[in-house]
UniProtKB/Swiss-Prot annotation:
Residues that hold Mg(2+) according to the record: D535, D537, D539
GO CC terms in record: DNA-directed RNA polymerase complex
Binding site for Zn(2+) 2: C891, C968, C975, C978
Taxonomic source organism: Mycobacterium tuberculosis (strain CDC 1551 / Oshkosh)
EC number: 2.7.7.6
Protein name: DNA-directed RNA polymerase subunit beta'
Cofactor remark from the record: Binds 1 Mg(2+) ion per subunit.
Phylogenetic lineage: Bacteria, Bacillati, Actinomycetota, Actinomycetes, Mycobacteriales
C-alpha cells in the first residue's frame, strides 16, 4: 500500500481496457460465488481464490501448502498463491466482454460527454447504443465519387424497368376493361352494372400506379440516402439499411451498438475537431457559438489531458475485490450477499450467453438482443436506475450499484472517509458537577478504567503488581483494589475530550481534566453548558481520549475549557453565570431599604450605627444575625479598589495601591461580590443583573489573562449557587398572583369590542376593518392587564425576581402565566380576533385551548424544519470555505474597507455606532488614525480592541480604514493581518488557523435560532423574506423575492404615478442617457431613505439619488449590485444584509466571518475574451490564477485575457472548487467524478476535506507544514523557565477546597459553608 505522507497530489483519469487488464489478477469466467455444500469459493467464479487470493492466511485452496514458511509459493494443483487472506481486500479481477459496452456515466450524464465529443444528440446516441438504429461509421467518399455516374445509370435502368412494367400492366388492364364493357353493352346490361365494372377497373389501375410509385419512391430514397451518406449519420429504418448494404455495401460501413461508437471514436481526430471548434467560436454567433463552446470544453479536456476517449467504451469490466462485496452466512444457513454480486452475476451470465451465441453463429437479431442486454447489465452495475427501470432484488428493492456506494450521506465519501468511528471513546448521560473547577469534568470510574485500560495495564506491570500483560489484563477485568490506585495515577494530567452532538461549532468538543466519580454519569461543569448547548434532562455526551503526547499537548493548550471562554463568533465570553447563579448573585447584590442593621446617621444622642471597620467585622455581624447582607452600610475597605470616578478624587494621580483605605457606602453583599473579582478591579456598586455580570466578564476578558478570567467565573459560579440556595427563590402556585383589576379591565374592552361588532353588522365596517379594529383593541387590553400585573406584584415575588435578574424567562411569559394569554395566531400567521382571556393559572376554556394549539403546533413543525435547514446551510458553508486557512503573516496590501465608528449628531456630539462590536472591533487598522489636529491616535497595523476604540472616539474620529479579508491579496487562504484578531483567543490569529471553518460554524450555529417563517411587512406589502430563508437566499446569490430596483446612475428622479404601476426615470447628473424603470407594481412601496437635507422621507418626484441606491421597498438583487457598483460594493451589501437578519434575532456575529464566506463567493471570473491565454471563453477561473496567467502572458508580450467578476452561490462555488475530492464528497458525486476523470484532474490536497478523505493530517493548525517537522532542543534557560510557569492549579483558590487530591469526591461530602 502507498503511504499517505509521501505524495502531494492525487490524479483521476479514464481507465482503458489495457489498464483494467493490468490491475487484474485473473479473469472471472463463471457467475458462481461459493459452493453451498463445502462453503468454499468456486474456481473461476466471483470469489475464486486463484484470482483474488486465499480465504485463510497462508493456506492454499486444496490444502497442499499450510504454513507461513511456504509464503509466496503458487500451488501447482489449485493455482492459489500462499499469502495473507488480507490480499482479498485489494486484488481485482476482470471480465472480458464478448462485445464492447459504453460507460453509462459518459453517455447518460448531463451533459452527455460522449454526445458532445461525437456531436450526436443524446437521443440518437441512445438509439445507437441500445440497437434501435444503425450508424454509418465510415464512407469511402473517393470510390463513391468515382463510380457515381455508373451507379446512377444503373439506378436509371432499374427505374425505367419499373416504369415499363407499370405501363405494360396498365395497358393490359385498360384493354380488359374495354372488352368487359363492350360485352356488357352487347348483353344490354343496365347503366348501374356498367358503372360498377368501370369503377372496379379504375380502382385496380390506381393500385397498380400506387404500387409502382411506392417502388420508385423507395429507389429514390435509397439513392438520395446513398449519395448523401456521411459518417455519424443515423439510419433508423432497418429495411432501408438492408437495401443499402445489399446494393452499395462496399462503399461504406455501418454498425449498431457500442461497437459502432468505438469505431467512431477510433476515427475521431481530436486536434482537428478542437481547431475547427475554436474557429467557430471566433467567427460564429448565437446558438452555434454556444454549442461550439460547450463541445470545446469536452474536446479540449481530452486534448489537454492526453486521456484517450477510448476509455468511454469498455472491452473489459473490472471486478472489485471480494472482501469489499462480501457474502456471509446467516444463522439460518441462508446467505446474505452484497448487491454487487448479483449485478456482477447478471453481467457474467449475459456475457457467457453472448459468447455461446456468437460461437453458434446465431442470427444477427438474436445476437444484437443479447448485446443490448449485456450493455444494460453493465449499466446497472455502474449506475443502477440511471437509465430505464432499476434492476430490483428480492422484495422490489433497487440493487445498490457502484455509483450508489459513493453517493449520499450513507455513501463511501460521507460515511467512511469523512466520518469514522474511533476507538478509545465512550458515551454516557451527563449530570451537573457544581463542585468541579472550570477545567475539570467528572468521569465515572468504570468508564475511566475501560478507556485507560492499556495505560493501567502497562503501569501495573511497571509496578510489579502483575507479571505480564495478560495477568494485568485479568486484574483490570476483575477490578482488583490495586487497579484503582493505578488508575488515579494514570489519569492525572491526562486530559480527555468531551463532545456533545450536534457539534455545531468548535466549542462542541472541549478538553477537560478528568476527576474520578462514583456512579455511571459524566459530570459536567455548569459554565460550559452554554458552549455545548447542553442541559441535564437526559442529554448524553461522548468522551474521547487523546493518546499521543502531541495530541495531549494540543488538548491541554488549545482545547482546555478554561482556554475557550470566548465565543469564536463574536469574541465575547460564553462561560457566564446563568440561571441559578444569576439569581444568586442578583439576590446577593440587591439593596433592601430598612433591612436589619441598616446604616443610621447620628441623630441627637444616638451615634451613627451600621458602620464597620472592615468587611470581616461586617461578616461577623451578619453571622451574629444583627446585619443583613442586603442592608445598606458604611464599611472601610483596604483590599478593594475604589470605582474609577472616586479613585482620582480620593488618591489623586498616584492612584489607589493595595492597603489604601477608603469608606464605601454599599451593602455587605456587594462587598462580598467584589471580593470575588481579581485584585485591583474597580469596585462595582450595582445590583447584579445578568447584563451587568456579562459586562464585567467581558471587561475581564479584555484586560486580564484567560487564567484569571477562568478563576473569576468559577468563584462567581460557587457564590451564585451558594446564595441562590440562601435566597429561597422557588416557584409555587401561591406565587402566581392574578391581578384583582383584571375583570374590570376586560369588561371595559369587551364593551369596545361589542361596538365594533355592531358597526360591522350594520355594514359600517368590512370584514378586514373589523378584524383590524378588534386586534388593536385586544392588544391594548393585553398590555393593560400586563401593566396591572406589574403593579400588583411585590418586589420580592420569586417569579418577578427570576425575570428581573435576567436569569430566564421574560415578562410576556409571566403575563401569560398570571394575567392573560392575549391574541394568538392561526397557521397562516394572522391574529385570530378572539383573544385568550384566561391565564394559565386560571385555566383555559375548551375553545381557548383549541385556538391556542394552532400556534403551538406550527411552532413545533417550524423548529423541526429549521434544525434540518440550518444543518444543511452549515454544511454548504463549511464546504465553500473549508480551504480558507491563514497562510501568511501579512500580504502587504494597502487596501482595506472603511468602517463607521460613530456619527455626528446635529449638536456636534458623537453617537457611538451600535454595530461597532461586529464591524471595527478586533480588526487591524489599515492606515494611521489621525485626529483633526494631525496627531496619530492609533498607528497603522494596531489591533482595535475596546481601549483603542474608546481612544478613537474620545479623539472625535468617526470612521477608520481597517484591513479586511475582502481586500486580502493572499492567493490561497488569507493573511493574519487582514483577518485581524482571532475572536476566540483575543490575539492576532495564528498562521494555520482554519478561519474558513470557524466562519462557517459561526454563521451556521445560530441558524437554528433564526425564524423559519417569511414575515409580512405591514398590510398588503410584498412578502419580504426574513430569517433562515433570507440567509440562504443571500448566500446562494439567488434573485430575491420582492426584488427592488436600484439606481444605475447618480441623478434626479422623475416619478410618474399610474393607477397600478409607478414609472421611475432617472436623469443622470453627467448628462448621459436617461434610465427608465417602468411597470413597477404599486404593492411594492417606495423606499424611505435619508435625503440630502437630512430628513427621512419616501422617495418622491425630483429627489436626488446616488448610484446603487434602492428605489423601492424589498431587497436588491446582488447580481444587479455587482453589475452597477462592482465586486467591492456587492461584498459589503451581502455582509450588511446577512447581518440584518441575525441582528433582528439578537445574534452577535462578527462581520469578518461573513466576509470570509462572501470572499469565496466572488473568487471566480468568467472569461469573456481569452486573448493569448489557454482559457476557454465562458469558463470560470479562479481570480488568483487568472491574474497570474495574465501577468505571464503580458510579460511574454501577448494579449491578456478579459474577464468579468461573477457572483456564485455557495453550493455552486463549492462544486466549482479545484479539488475534485472535496467537490465529489459534497454533492452530485457522479457528475463531479465524471468531469474530473475526463479532464484528468489533479487534486493538490490544499483544503481540509481532501486530506481527511485520504487520511492525512489536515493542513491547518498544528498540521500545517511549517509546524510538522519541528525538532525541539531546549536551551538551559528555557529548561529552567519551563518549571516556573504557574499552572492553573497553583493560583487557583485552593485555601477553600484544600489541595485537589484527584480522588473521586462523593457529592454529599461537599460542605458549602464558605461560598467562595
Amino acid at each position: 500500500m502507498l503511504d499517505v505522507n509521501f505524495f502531494d497530489e492525487l490524479r483521476i483519469g479514464l481507465a482503458t481496457a489495457e489498464d483494467i487488464r493490468q490491475w487484474s489478477y485473473g479473469e472471472v469466467k463463471k457467475p458462481e460465488t461459493i459452493n453451498y455444500r463445502t462453503l468454499k469459493p468456486e474456481k473461476d467464479g466471483l470469489f475464486c481464490e486463484k484470482i483474488f487470493g486465499p480465504t485463510r492466511d497462508w493456506e492454499c485452496y486444496c490444502g497442499k501448502y499450510k504454513r507461513v514458511r511456504f509464503k509466496g509459493i503458487i500451488c501447482e494443483r489449485c493455482g492459489v498463491e500462499v499469502t495473507r487472506a488480507k490480499v482479498r481486500r485489494e486484488r481485482m479481477g476482470h471480465i472480458e466482454l464478448a462485445a464492447p459496452v459504453t460507460h453509462i456515466w459518459y453517455f447518460k450524464g448531463v451533459p452527455s460527454r460522449l454526445g458532445y465529443l461525437l456531436d450526436l444528440a443524446p437521443k440518437d446516441l441512445e438509439k445507437i447504443i441500445y440497437f434501435a438504429a444503425y450508424v454509418i461509421t465510415s464512407v469511402d467518399e473517393e470510390m463513391r465519387h468515382n463510380e457515381l455516374s455508373t451507379l446512377e445509370a444503373e439506378m436509371a435502368v432499374e427505374r425505367k424497368a419499373v416504369e415499363d412494367q407499370r405501363d405494360g400492366e396498365l395497358e393490359a388492364r385498360a384493354q380488359k376493361l374495354e372488352a368487359d364493357l363492350a360485352e356488357l353493352e352487347a348483353e344490354g346490361a343496365k347503366a348501374d352494372a356498367r358503372r360498377k365494372v368501370r369503377d372496379g377497373g379504375e380502382r385496380e389501375m390506381r393500385q397498380i400506379r400506387d404500387r409502382a410509385q411506392r417502388e420508385l419512391d423507395r429507389l429514390e430514397d435509397i439513392w438520395s440516402t446513398f449519395t448523401k451518406l456521411a459518417p455519424k449519420q443515423l439510419i433508423v429504418d432497418e429495411n432501408l439499411y438492408r437495401e443499402l448494404v445489399d446494393r452499395y455495401g462496399e462503399y461504406f460501413t455501418g454498425a449498431m451498438g457500442a461497437e459502432s461508437i468505438q469505431k467512431l471514436i477510433e476515427n475521431f481526430d481530436i486536434d482537428a475537431e478542437a481547431e475547427s471548434l475554436r474557429d467557430v467560436i471566433r467567427n460564429g454567433k448565437g446558438q452555434k457559438k454556444l454549442r461550439a463552446l460547450k463541445r470545446l470544453k469536452v474536446v479540449a479536456a481530452f486534448q489537454q489531458s492526453g486521456n484517450s476517449p477510448m476509455g468511454m467504451v469498455l472491452d473489459a469490466v473490472p471486478v472489485i475485490p471480494p472482501e469489499l462485496r462480501p457474502m456471509v452466512q446467516l444463522d439460518g444457513g441462508r446467505f446474505a450477499t452484497s448487491d454487487l454480486n448479483d449485478l456482477y452475476r447478471r453481467v457474467i451470465n449475459r456475457n457467457n450467453r453472448l459468447k455461446r451465441l456468437i460461437d453458434l453463429g446465431a442470427p444477427e437479431i438474436i445476437v444484437n438482443n443479447e448485446k443490448r442486454m449485456l450493455q444494460e447489465s453493465v449499466d446497472a452495475l455502474f449506475d443502477n436506475g440511471r437509465r430505464g427501470r432499476p434492476v430490483t432484488g428480492p422484495g422490489n428493492r433497487p440493487l445498490k450499484s457502484l455509483s450508489d456506494l459513493l453517493k449520499g450521506k450513507q455513501g463511501r465519501f460521507r460515511q467512511n472517509l469523512l466520518g469514522k468511528r474511533v476507538d478509545y471513546s465512550g458515551r454516557s448521560v451527563i449530570v451537573v458537577g457544581p463542585q468541579l473547577k472550570l477545567h475539570q469534568c467528572g468521569l465515572p470510574k468504570l468508564m475511566a478504567l475501560e478507556l485507560f485500560k492499556p495505560f493501567v495495564m502497562k503501569r501495573l506491570v511497571d509496578l510489579n503488581h502483575a507479571q505480564n500483560i495478560k495477568s494485568a489484563k485479568r486484574m483490570v477485568e476483575r477490578q482488583r483494589p490495586q487497579v484503582w490506585d493505578v488508575l488515579e495515577e494514570v489519569i492525572a494530567e491526562h486530559p480527555v475530550l468531551l463532545n456533545r452532538a450536534p457539534t455545531l461549532h468548535r466549542l462542541g468538543i472541549q478538553a477537560f481534566e478528568p476527576m474520578l466519580v462514583e456512579g455511571k454519569a459524566i459530570q459536567l461543569h455548569p459554565l460550559v453548558c452554554e458552549a455545548f448547548n447542553a442541559d441535564f434532562d437526559g442529554d448524553q455526551m461522548a468522551v474521547h481520549l487523546p493518546l499521543s503526547a502531541e495530541a495531549q499537548a494540543e488538548a491541554r493548550i488549545l482545547m482546555l475549557s478554561s482556554n475557550n471562554i470566548l465565543s469564536p463568533a463574536s469574541g465575547r465570553p460564553l462561560a457566564m453565570p446563568r440561571l441559578d447563579m444569576v439569581t444568586g448573585l442578583y439576590y446577593l447584590t440587591t439593596e433592601v431599604p430598612e433591612d436589619t442593621g441598616e446604616y443610621q446617621p447620628a441623630s441627637g444622642d444616638h451615634p451613627e450605627t451600621g458602620v464597620y471597620s472592615s468587611p470581616a467585622e461586617a461578616i461577623m455581624a451578619a453571622d451574629r444575625g444583627v446585619l443583613s447582607v442586603r442592608a445598606k452600610i458604611k464599611v472601610r475597605l483596604t483590599q478593594l479598589r475604589p470605582p474609577v470616578e472616586i479613585e482620582a478624587e480620593l488618591f489623586g494621580h498616584s492612584g489607589w495601591q493595595p492597603g489604601d483605605a477608603w469608606m464605601a457606602e454599599t451593602t455587605l453583599g456587594r462587598v462580598m461580590f467584589n471580593e470575588l473579582l481579581p485584585l485591583g478591579y474597580p469596585f462595582v456598586n450595582k445590583q447584579m443583573h445578568k447584563k451587568v455580570q456579562a459586562a464585567i466578564i467581558n471587561d475581564l476578558a479584555e484586560r486580564y489573562p484567560m487564567i484569571v478570567v477562568a478563576q473569576t467565573v468559577d468563584k462567581l459560579k460557587d457564590a451564585g449557587f451558594y446564595w441562590a440556595t440562601r435566597s429561597g427563590v422557588t416557584v409555587s402556585m401561591a406565587d402566581v398572583l392574578v391581578p384583582p383589576r383584571k375583570k374590570e379591565i376586560l369588561d371595559h374592552y369587551e364593551e369596545r369590542a361589542d361596538k365594533v361588532e355592531k358597526q360591522f353588522q350594520r355594514g359600517a365596517l368590512n370584514h378586514d376593518e373589523r378584524n383590524e379594529a378588534l386586534v388593536e383593541i385586544w392588544k391594548e387590553a393585553t398590555d393593560e392587564v400586563g401593566q396591572a400585573l406589574r403593579e400588583h406584584y411585590p418586589d420580592d415575588n420569586p417569579i418577578i425576581t427570576i425575570v428581573d435578574s435576567g436569569a430566564t424567562g421574560n415578562f410576556t411569559q409571566t403575563r401569560t402565566l398570571a394575567g392573560m394569554k392575549g391574541l394568538v395566531t392561526n397557521p397562516k400567521g394572522e391574529f385570530i380576533p378572539r383573544p385568550v382571556k384566561s391565564s394559565f393559572r386560571e385555566g383555559l376554556t375548551v375553545l381557548e385551548y383549541f385556538i391556542n394549539t394552532h400556534g403551538a403546533r406550527k411552532g413545533l413543525a417550524d423548529t423541526a424544519l429549521r434544525t434540518a435547514d440550518s444543518g444543511y446551510l452549515t454544511r454548504r458553508l463549511v464546504d465553500v470555505s473549508q480551504d480558507v486557512i491563514v497562510r501568511e503573516h501579512d500580504c502587504q496590501t494597502e487596501r482595506g474597507i472603511v468602517v463607521e465608528l460613530a456619527e455626528r449628531a446635529p449638536d456636534g456630539t458623537l453617537i457611538r455606532d451600535p454595530y461597532i462590536e461586529t464591524s471595527a472591533y478586533a480588526r487591524t487598522l489599515g492606515t494611521d488614525a489621525v485626529d483633526e489636529a494631525g496627531n496619530v491616535i492609533v498607528e497603522r497595523g494596531q489591533d482595535l480592541g475596546d481601549p483603542e476604540i474608546d481612544a478613537l472616539l474620545a479623539a472625535g474620529i468617526t470612521q477608520v480604514k481597517v484591513r479586511s479579508v475582502l481586500t486580502c491579496a493572499t492567493s490561497t487562504g488569507v493573511c493574519a493581518t487582514c483577518y485581524g484578531r482571532s475572536m476566540a483567543t483575543g490575539k492576532l490569529v495564528d498562521i494555520g488557523e482554519a478561519v474558513g471553518i470557524v466562519a462557517a460554524q459561526s454563521i451556521g450555529e445560530p441558524g437554528t435560532q433564526l425564524t423559519m417563517r417569511t414575515f409580512h411587512q405591514g398590510g398588503v406589502g410584498e412578502d419580504i423574506t426574513g430569517g433562515l430563508p433570507r440567509v440562504q437566499e443571500l448566500f446562494e446569490a439567488r434573485v430575491p423575492r420582492g426584488k427592488a430596483p436600484i439606481a444605475d446612475v447618480t441623478g434626479r428622479v422623475r416619478l410618474e404615478d399610474g393607477e397600478r404601476f409607478y414609472k421611475i426615470t432617472i436623469v443622470p447628473d453627467d448628462g448621459g442617457e436617461e434610465v427608465v424603470y417602468d411597470k413597477i407594481s404599486k404593492r411594492q412601496r417606495l423606499r424611505v431613505f435619508k435625503h440630502e437635507d437630512g430628513s427621512e422621507r419616501v422617495l418622491s418626484d425630483g429627489d436626488h439619488v446616488e448610484v446603487g441606491q434602492q428605489l423601492m421597498e424589498g431587497s436588491a438583487d446582488p447580481h444587479e449590485v455587482l453589475r452597477v457598483q462592482g465586486p467591492r460594493e456587492v461584498q459589503i451589501h451581502l455582509v450588511r444584509e446577512v447581518q440584518e437578519v441575525y441582528r433582528a434575532q439578537g445574534v452577535s456575529i462578527h462581520d469578518k466571518h461573513i466576509e470570509v464566506i462572501v470572499r469565496q463567493m466572488l473568487r471566480r471570473v468568467t472569461i469573456i475574451d481569452s486573448g493569448s491565454t489557454e482559457f476557454l471563453p465562458g469558463s470560470l477561473i479562479d481570480r488568483a490564477e487568472f491574474e497570474a496567467e495574465n501577468r505571464r502572458v503580458v510579460a511574454e508580450g501577448g494579449e491578456p485575457a478579459a474577464g468579468r467578476p461573477v457572483l456564485m452561490g455557495i453550493t455552486k462555488a463549492s462544486l466549482a472548487t479545484d479539488s475534485w475530492l472535496s467537490a465529489a464528497s459534497f454533492q452530485e458525486t457522479t457528475r463531479v467524478l465524471t468531469d474530473a476523470a475526463i479532464n484528468c484532474r489533479s487534486d493538490k490536497l490544499n483544503g481540509l476535506k481532501e486530506n481527511v478523505i485520504i487520511g492525512k493530517l489536515i493542513p491547518a493548525g498544528t498540521g500545517i507544514n511549517r509546524y510538522r517537522n519541528i525538532a525541539v532542543q531546549p536551551t538551559e534557560e528555557a529548561r529552567a523557565a519551563a518549571y516556573t510557569i504557574p499552572s492553573y492549579e497553583d493560583q487557583y483558590y485552593s485555601p477553600d477546597f484544600g489541595a485537589a487530591t484527584g480522588a473521586a469526591v462523593p457529592l454529599d461530602d461537599y460542605g458549602y459553608s464558605d461560598y467562595r
